[in-house]
């Protein structure tokens, strides 16, 4: 059992995910104390904020994105994977990107695939203690899927609207997206 299964399987732990599909996937696996909770704000607090015209010019935009683009472990995993595994994982991610409202990652990553990856890792480095489990690999693919989706959306929005990105990472490669830090 991996750490995430221990955490989610503990009946004392209540977990709230802002990602509805991820929360449902965990519930489908039998973790009954995982719930979807959209990110919220205190609207009344923001109603009272008054900006100068200089601040409005600096921070105002038609679209603002605040947050991480999920720089996860996918590049590190694919770097040491077989060409077949890389191609399969890319195909799975690209398929998931096309299926809004459906979640396939947990169904298309099976035990044999994970075992084959672990066997390959062991062949590369016989002394390695690195072992992937299905939940960890699916999580890595979830993050990469979200990252690619956010990159696509930011590129699209930046090409059509005044768009600002607030993130710790530097993404100055986007055309039409102003990185605000």
Model-identified regions with their sequence ranges:
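A conserved, positively charged/aromatic
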Residues: 4-15
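A short, active-site helix/loop in glycosyltransferases that binds the activated sugar's phosphate group
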Residues: 15-32, 152
């Amino acid at each position: 059992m991996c750490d995430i299964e221990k955490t989610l399987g503990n009946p004392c732990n209540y977990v709230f995910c802002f990602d509805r599909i991820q929360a449902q996937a965990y519930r489908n696996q039998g973790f009954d104390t995982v719930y979807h909770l959209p990110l919220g704000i205190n609207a009344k607090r923001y109603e009272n904020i008054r900006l100068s015209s200089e601040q409005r010019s600096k921070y105002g935009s038609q679209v603002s994105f605040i947050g991480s683009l999920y720089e996860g472990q996918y590049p590190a995993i694919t770097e040491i994977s077989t060409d077949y595994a890389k191609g399969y994982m890319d195909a799975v991610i690209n398929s998931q990107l096309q299926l809004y409202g459906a979640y396939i990652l947990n169904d298309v990553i099976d035990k044999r695939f994970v075992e084959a990856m672990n066997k390959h890792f062991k062949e590369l480095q016989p002394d390695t203690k690195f072992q992937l489990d299905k939940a960890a690999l699916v999580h890595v693919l979830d993050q990469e899927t979200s990252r690619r989706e956010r990159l696509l959306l930011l590129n699209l929005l930046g090409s059509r609207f005044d768009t600002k990105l607030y993130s710790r990472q530097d993404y100055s490669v986007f055309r039409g997206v102003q990185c605000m830090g």
